[in-house]
Each structure stands twice: as C-alpha cells, then as structure tokens.
UniProtKB/Swiss-Prot annotation:
InterPro entries per UniProt: Tropomyosin
UniProt-recorded name of the protein: Tropomyosin
Family, as annotated: Belongs to the tropomyosin family.
Source organism phylogeny: Eukaryota, Metazoa, Ecdysozoa, Nematoda, Chromadorea
Swiss-Prot/TrEMBL domain comment: The molecule is in a coiled coil structure that is formed by 2 polypeptide chains. The sequence exhibits a prominent seven-residues periodicity.
Region (Disordered): 113-143
UniProt keyword terms in alphabetical order: Coiled coil, Repeat
Basic and acidic residues composition-biased segments: 113-142
C-alpha cells in the first residue's frame, strides 16, 4: 500500500513537473513569437526609413538640377545684355559726330547771315544818302537799288538758310536728346545687369554651398544606407536565428506535448490499476 502511495506521489510529482515544463515551453514560445513580431516591425520601420532616405536624396538631386538650369538662364541673359552695350556706344559716338558737323554748318550759316545783314544795312545807308541827294544820279540810284535788291535776296536766302539750319539743328538736338535718353537707358540697363549679375553671383555661391551641403547630405545618406543595410542584415540574421529558435522550441513543445500525452496515458493506466487494486482490496 505504501509503495502504491509513493508511486502515486511520484507520478503526481512527475505529472506536475511535466505540466510545468509544458507551461514554461509555451511561455517561451509566446515570448519568442512576440520577439519575432518586434523584429519584423523593426524591419518594416527600417525599410520605410530607407525609402524616405532615397526619396530625400532624389529630391535633393532634382533641386540641384533646377538650380543649375536657372543659373544657365541667368548667364545667357547677362551675355545678351553685355552684347547690347557696344552698339549703343557706337550709336552715341555717331550722334556726337553728327552734332559737331551740324554745329559747324550752323556757324557757317550764321557768318553768312551776318555778312548779308551788314550788306543790307550798308545798302540801306547808301539808299538814304542817295535819297538825301535827291537822286542826283539816277544811274547810280538804279545801281544802288539793284544792289539793295540783291542784298535783300541775299538776306532772304540767309534767312531761309538760317531757318533750314535751325530746323536741322532742332532735329539734331532731338536726335541727341533721344540718343542721350537711350544712352541713359543703356547705362541704367547696365546697372540693372550688373546688379542682376551680382545677384546671380550670390546665387551661384549659394548654389555652390547648397551643392556642397547636398553632397554632404548624400554622403550622410549613403552612410545611413550602409548603417541601415548593416542593421537590416543583422536583423535578418537575428530573424533567421529566431526562426531556428522557434523551430527548435516548436519541436521541444511538440516533444513535451507528446510526453504529456504519454504521461497522461501512464497516469490513466496507473489510475485504472489503483482503482482495480482498491476494488480487489475492498473486495478482499
């Protein structure tokens, strides 16, 4: 009887131990499953970060390409503006030369007008003298009258030429004024272009700094990609190790479950034997 009780106690202890081992195995499987899920979540986050890093790098490259295109356009505008300056300078030189020639022609016409005016005054004086002498010499009077008419014609011609010269001078002055306006506009354009060139230079310096920063960011991205790749490889290794561990644990759980079934069978057999023994004892 004591042997049977000891055997029953031993079987109960063995059964409890098996159940505890099975529970421990299940808990370990659950922990490994949770750990594997965390590893998979970390792997997904790493992949998202890698995609974001690639997108940032592509955007930086696109921004750099746009900046280079804008810089080329600015350089073309500056070159075009610089090409417009020499023709304006040549035009100003031609207008100045034309103005000098017009002033010279005006001086000549003015001298002729002064001479004609002097001749007319002299003729008028002579005419008055002749009138005071009561036209004593008709022939001389006619001569003087002819000279007077000629002088008047010369004066009219001088007036006409003076008007023509004045008109041409006004035209030249208007052309000169327009040329000065164009020259002033050209100078303003040059100032604007110089300012734009300065801005372009500053933008170029900024782009060079931005390009250097972009290269640094690219190096940083490459370093991050290498780090992420290493972490990914490490995560894959850990995942493979975890998978192998899970497989081993699963095998251990299966073994423990089989052992538990076996122990339950043994416990059932022992219980049946005990029942039969009790029946025999009580029957005895």
């Amino acid at each position: 009887m004591d042997a049977i009780k000891k055997k029953m106690q031993a079987m109960k202890i063995e059964k409890d131990t098996a159940l505890d081992r099975a529970d421990a195995a299940k808990e370990k499987v659950r922990q490994m499953t949770d750990k594997l899920e965390r590893i998979e979540e970390e792997l997904r986050d790493t992949q998202k970060k890698m995609m974001q890093t690639e997108n940032d790098l592509n955007k930086a490259q696109e921004d750099l390409a746009v900046a280079n295109t804008n810089l080329e356009d600015k350089e073309k505008k500056v070159q075009k503006a610089e090409a417009e300056v020499p023709p304006l300078n040549r035009r100003m030189t031609l207008l100045e030369e034309e103005l000098e020639r017009a002033e010279e022609r005006l001086k000549i016409a003015t001298d002729k007008l002064e001479k004609a005016t002097h001749t007319a005054d002299e003729s008028d004086r002579v005419r008055k003298v002749m009138e005071n002498r009561s036209f004593q010499d008709e022939e001389r009077a006619n001569t003087v009258e002819s000279q007077l008419k000629e002088a008047q014609l010369l004066a009219e011609e001088a007036d006409r030429k003076y008007d023509e010269v004045a008109r041409k001078l006004a035209m030249v002055e208007a052309d000169l004024e327009r040329a000065e306006e164009r020259a002033e506009a050209g100078e303003n354009k040059i100032v604007e272009l110089e300012e734009e060139l300065r801005v372009v230079g500053n933008n170029l310096k900024f782009l060079e700094v931005s390009e250097e920063k972009a290269l640094q960011r690219e190096d940083s991205y490459e370093e991050q990609i290498r780090t992420v790749s290493a972490r990914l490889k490490e995560a894959e290794t850990r995942a493979e190790f975890a998978e192998r561990s899970v497989q081993k644990l699963q095998k251990e759980v299966d073994r423990l479950e089989d052992e538990l079934v076996h122990e339950k069978g043994r416990y059932k057999n022992i219980s049946e034997e005990l029942d039969q023994t009790f029946q025999e004892l009580f029957g005895y």
